[in-house]
A protein has these predicted regions:
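Flexible, acidic/Gly-rich N-terminal and inter-domain linker regions that tether
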Residues: 1-74
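Conserved Radical SAM active-site core
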Residues: 41-126
Length: 126
């Protein structure tokens, strides 16, 4: 899957680009990735390295998620990908979120496909 153009960044006078998505304000040189490992400078622009790629898909009861009183009794279509700008030692997905191995992201689906499959399975949320 091709790398997807990213939003929320701007060019700097020194040839780098700055990510404006989170408070880390990563300033990247060509080929460099941000702290999240998801956003990269390529060809003078910001691209997403994991767009449309996932470490897996699953339908879960909403109660399994850290969402209090959100559609009680419903199902959620869950998926995950590598990349996170945090470094929480207690994170249950630390090995995935901090993975630098893009081969772990073996499943692929566009946002439209994810929404379609979630609706087909009666999931009220993604």
């Amino acid at each position: 899957m091709d790398k997807h153009p990213a939003r929320y960044w701007h060019a700097l006078d020194d040839g780098r680009i700055q990510c404006d998505l989170c408070p880390r304000d990563c300033r990247l040189h060509e080929g460099q990735r941000g702290a999240c490992f998801v956003r990269q400078m390529e060809g003078g622009r910001m691209v997403l390295t994991t767009y449309g790629r996932s470490s897996g898909f699953c339908i879960d009861p909403i109660e399994k998620k850290p969402l209090n009183h959100f559609y009680p009794g419903s199902s959620v279509f869950s998926f995950g990908t590598a990349g996170c700008n945090l470094a929480c030692k207690f994170c249950q997905n630390w090995d995935i979120s901090k993975s630098r191995d893009m081969d772990r992201l073996i499943d692929a689906a566009s946002p439209a496909e994810i929404a379609r499959v979630a609706a087909e399975h009666g999931c009220r949320s993604v």
